[in-house]
């Protein structure tokens, strides 16, 4: 269930403050944030935001198609190690039995 429309989108106050200051100055620096729950607003388009994934900050360039999504959607938190090799698994079973 999503957030009520009458409440408006959630954006961390310090993040929106930094975005607005940079828009006034016309700067395009990378902004580090831990706020994965913040929603992407139209005024963020064109900025690069480094979103924390639990281990490091992943740079995310904001485009128009991302408006309305959350920052955390673009910074995966889980690492996929790959599926096990069938030959290696078969060899382990033969050695045990």
UniProtKB/Swiss-Prot annotation:
Q: Which GO terms describe its cellular component?
A: cytoplasm; small ribosomal subunit
Q: Which domain of life is it from?
A: Bacteria
Q: Which GO terms describe its molecular function?
A: rRNA binding; structural constituent of ribosome
Q: Which GO terms describe its biological process?
A: ribosomal small subunit assembly; translation
Q: What does this protein do?
A: Protein S19 forms a complex with S13 that binds strongly to the 16S ribosomal RNA.
Tell me which family the UniProt entry assigns to this protein. Belongs to the universal ribosomal protein uS19 family.
Record protein name field: Small ribosomal subunit protein uS19
Q: To which species is this protein native?
A: Petrotoga mobilis (strain DSM 10674 / SJ95)
């Amino acid at each position: 269930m999503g957030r009520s429309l009458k409440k408006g989108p959630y954006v961390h106050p310090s993040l929106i403050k930094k975005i607005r200051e940079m828009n006034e100055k016309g700067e395009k620096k990378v902004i580090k944030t831990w706020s994965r729950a913040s929603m992407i607003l139209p005024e963020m388009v064109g900025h690069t935001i480094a979103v924390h994934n639990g281990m490091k900050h992943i740079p995310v360039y904001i485009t128009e198609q991302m408006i309305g999504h959350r920052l955390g959607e673009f910074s995966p938190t889980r690492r996929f190690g790959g599926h096990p090799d069938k030959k290696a698994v078969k060899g382990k079973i033969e050695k045990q039995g």
